[in-house]
Amino acid sequence: MSATYAPDRILLEKAETLSEALPYIQRYAGKIFVVKYGGHAMGNPDAAQDFAEDIVLLKAIGIHPVVVHGGGPQIGKMLKALGVESQFIDGLRVTDNETAKIAEMVLSGAINKDIVSWIGRAGGRAVGISGKDAKLVEVEKVKKIRKNSTDGQDENIDLGFVGRPVSVDRRLIDTLTQSGMIPVVAPIGVGADGETYNINADTMAGALAAGLEAARLFLLTDVAGVLDADKKLLRTLTPSQIDSLTKADVISGGMIPKLETCIESVKSGVDAAVILDGRVPHSILIELFTEQGAGTLVKLD
């Protein structure tokens, strides 16, 4: 009697994982995914390598990833190194002309090219751009209003060169993705006045996802996702559920603007937005290609 081949358990699990991924690969082939990359995943070489490999794999199976990156901490370090003092109003950095130039240098000249290099080492072909290139993202100046502490009247606060996306011209991104390239986008845009404006990276990613009619928006963070009152991960959320949880103070702090970006994107036509833990190796692949997923998925009611 011939011996029966018993496959190694680990090999069998890998084969089952690939089999489980097949319907998702078929579903998303040819679709655009916008991935906001930042936090721990950006500062750790091992995490950066894992991220780059995930992005290259997505491209290899027919998905078109577009990477948007942040860089606030790195900008802060450079400003400090150059002896430039930062001014903050209600927790928001005031971006004067000098600060804007330094921010662009760090975002487009350093961080952006580092990510391009990581993707290149993983076998991909990446191109570093910003929202200024080909007027990819046009912005309007952010206007902030607060109550005057003296008389309680509204007053306008000038944050300098900080912008909010108002339009996306997708032609450059389409040209790059159709040529087999992976766009890596720095969160910088151009105003109607021709000036350069910094953009919040989450906001930039959300605007691009909407403008590119992306199937998915991923926001990589340093938390597991959105947690309930018992600190357990919420797998899916709708705008109405988010509103209820926010009113109950279950959702608070920095998670609120991230979820606002998710809601705006799905209301603008993005199929779903996902808040993911960038500290978890291959979290994007786990979220996409397994039934359980890895983060919090936001979809319409």
UniProtKB/Swiss-Prot annotation:
Pathway: Amino-acid biosynthesis; L-arginine biosynthesis; N(2)-acetyl-L-ornithine from L-glutamate: step 2/4. NCBIfam families: argB. GO terms for molecular function: acetylglutamate kinase activity; ATP binding. This is Acetylglutamate kinase. It is found in: Cytoplasm. CDD domains: AAK_NAGK-C. Keywords: Amino-acid biosynthesis, Arginine biosynthesis, ATP-binding, Cytoplasm, Kinase, Nucleotide-binding, Transferase. The record marks K36, K258 as: Transition state stabilizer. Substrate binds at G71, G72, R93, N198. Belongs to the acetylglutamate kinase family. ArgB subfamily. It comes from the Bacteria. GO terms for cellular component: cytoplasm. It catalyses: N-acetyl-L-glutamate + ATP = N-acetyl-L-glutamyl 5-phosphate + ADP. It holds the Pfam family AA_kinase. PANTHER family: N-ACETYLGLUTAMATE SYNTHASE, N-ACETYLGLUTAMATE SYNTHASE, MITOCHONDRIAL. GO terms for biological process: arginine biosynthetic process via ornithine; L-arginine biosynthetic process. Catalyzes the ATP-dependent phosphorylation of N-acetyl-L-glutamate. The gene is argB. It comes from Zymomonas mobilis subsp. mobilis (strain ATCC 31821 / ZM4 / CP4). Its EC number is 2.7.2.8. The lineage of its organism: Bacteria, Pseudomonadati, Pseudomonadota, Alphaproteobacteria, Sphingomonadales. SUPFAM superfamilies: Carbamate kinase-like. It is an enzyme of class 2 (transferase). HAMAP family: ArgB.
